């Protein structure tokens, strides 16, 4: 069994484009595995879909509408037993501009 609480770094990523998000998650996992740390993920989280309906006609024709949607894809990566080498490698990692990253460290 474990000897005590271990620190877990939880990385949550969001993007509108799932291909860019998956590539970023793959880059993070490869970087963490190269530094001999334990990684769980990427775990796909539910996609948030925001739908907007607008009238396509400026005056009449209430039945004529257009629907638009924005999909926000999310992934979760957990890093267990992260060393200083792992954190330094993650800081040097360059990710695309369309990916929003939130990092949280906690003890398990």
UniProtKB/Swiss-Prot annotation:
GO terms for molecular function: structural constituent of ribosome; tRNA binding. GO terms for biological process: translation. Coiled coil: none annotated. The keyword Electron transport does not apply. One of its GO terms (cellular component) is small ribosomal subunit. Disulfide bonds: none annotated. The keyword Ribonucleoprotein applies. Keywords: Ribonucleoprotein, Ribosomal protein. Pfam families: Ribosomal_S10 (PF00338). Involved in the binding of tRNA to the ribosomes. Part of the 30S ribosomal subunit. Belongs to the universal ribosomal protein uS10 family. PANTHER family: 30S RIBOSOMAL PROTEIN S10 FAMILY MEMBER (PTHR11700). This is Small ribosomal subunit protein uS10. It comes from Rhodopirellula baltica (strain DSM 10527 / NCIMB 13988 / SH1).
């Amino acid at each position: 069994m474990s000897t005590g609480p271990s620190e877990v770094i939880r990385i949550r990523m969001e993007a509108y484009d799932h291909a860019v998000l998956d590539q970023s998650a793959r880059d993070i996992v490869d970087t963490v595995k190269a530094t001999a740390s334990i990684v769980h993920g990427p775990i796909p989280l539910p996609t948030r879909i925001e739908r907007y309906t607008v009238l396509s006609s400026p005056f009449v024709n209430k039945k004529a509408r257009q629907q638009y949607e924005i999909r926000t894809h999310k992934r979760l990566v957990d890093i267990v037993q992260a060393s200083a080498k792992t954190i330094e490698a993650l800081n040097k990692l360059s990710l695309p501009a369309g990916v929003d990253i939130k990092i949280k460290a906690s003890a398990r």
